[in-house]
Amino acid sequence: MSRNTEATDDVKTWTGGPLNYKEGFFTQLATDELAKGINEEVVRAISAKRNEPEWMLEFRLNAYRAWLEMEEPHWLKAHYDKLNYQDYSYYSAPSCGNCDDTCASEPGAVQQTGANAFLSKEVEAAFEQLGVPVREGKEVAVDAIFDSVSVATTYREKLAEQGIIFCSFGEAIHDHPELVRKYLGTVVPGNDNFFAALNAAVASDGTFIYVPKGVRCPMELSTYFRINAEKTGQFERTILVADEDSYVSYIEGCSAPVRDSYQLHAAVVEVIIHKNAEVKYSTVQNWFPGDNNTGGILNFVTKRALCEGENSKMSWTQSETGSAITWKYPSCILRGDNSIGEFYSVALTSGHQQADTGTKMIHIGKNTKSTIISKGISAGHSQNSYRGLVKIMPTATNARNFTQCDSMLIGANCGAHTFPYVECRNNSAQLEHEATTSRIGEDQLFYCLQRGISEEDAISMIVNGFCKDVFSELPLEFAVEAQKLLAISLEHSVG
């Protein structure tokens, strides 16, 4: 391990032992961190540290007050111990890399928000160990998020030459307030649900992207989220806007150190697609999975896209292999006539992981189309659930939907569950739904073993074939990474 990392016995077990989570290292560095607990004073302190304008503070406070009136939902098909929201710190950042660290010791001090203000040598080394480029050189633009703050954003100036805004959420509030105010909360309101309201109250850095009219983004845009501090949550807010006749492909990845207690990740993503625009949004999720109700990330995320204009198109693609519990439904509201929504998902659970994930396709405009391809793989003692909603509104004349929901079981102690909901309120709509549940057959394994292929390699090959419809939608280099993570997650799941 590099000099900035600390390896406990637990970390060594996870990173090099049977469970093989190589991203589980912890970065030792000075931090500026709020005390545990959440109240109105904490919300104000977060806003002050980020030097936000009054309108952003009001957005936070309104969401916090709405959150206080809500009850935490528990209808998902998964179990976790009751969370104590006063036992988390809601702001943690590396002590500013461009000063002598005295600011970190002053209560309420305002941190720097400029580019690379938090990129200390320890933080840069951590991202280097993760294989995430925080300096320009590779033809992919990266926004690197470390706990509550963005520490580096590459290719901003090159993208700006074409009018593309690619920056952290915090920088967008200061540099492009008119755009943030126009779109913030329009797709996911501050009081949308329990975890979205919590996010709106304590929102940390996510990524802000705006692609202007008629521009095709010349490179992949990406964000990497790293949780490092103990007993913190990550609550990034991401907004992506594709103006008329534009195109952008965006991908996000993530990881966290090994911890023996739950950490909460409650993000919100809002995507707005205007007339004739297209967005491809890909996720390779690799949060620390924990084991048998011990540690891991609780991944409770709200993601929603609004296809506002005619002929707009949104594609969600996700590979979910990490986190103790995944609870998320990337969704599309198809308001524009002839708009298209797509959802391609691979969700693998192993060990004692639990997942309740799927999508919602809300058809409002005429001639709207949606496609749902979901692949769920269960191994070990895990439980994997698909939950989807297809809703055809009365105005959605000639709406079309195709749903394919496939589950695969590996072993005798896991479970696969499906909860499809269909609501059709227009007689001209056409909906198709296919579903299968299968096991890896003994004859398949026997065939591979007879040809010198090990049992683990055989299972990996079969599972990759099962997932090919989804992996083909990912950018090539990320599809390769997703396949590797799938293989690692399946290790030692045989038997």
Swiss-Prot record:
Q: Read off the Pfam families from this record.
A: SUFBD_core, SufBD_N
Enumerate the GO terms in the molecular function aspect: 2 iron, 2 sulfur cluster binding; 4 iron, 4 sulfur cluster binding
Q: Which GO terms describe its biological process?
A: iron-sulfur cluster assembly
Provide GO CC annotations from the record. iron-sulfur cluster assembly complex
Q: Which family does it belong to?
A: Belongs to the iron-sulfur cluster assembly SufBD family.
Subunit-level organization: Part of the SufBCD complex that contains SufB, SufC and SufD. Interacts with SufA.
Q: What does this protein do?
A: The SufBCD complex acts synergistically with SufE to stimulate the cysteine desulfurase activity of SufS. The SufBCD complex contributes to the assembly or repair of oxygen-labile iron-sulfur clusters under oxidative stress. May facilitate iron uptake from extracellular iron chelators under iron limitation.
PANTHER family membership: FES CLUSTER ASSEMBLY PROTEIN SUF, UPF0051 PROTEIN ABCI8, CHLOROPLASTIC-RELATED
What is the protein's name according to its record?
Iron-sulfur cluster assembly protein SufB
Its ancestry begins with: Bacteria, Pseudomonadati, Pseudomonadota, Gammaproteobacteria, Enterobacterales
Q: Which gene encodes it?
A: sufB
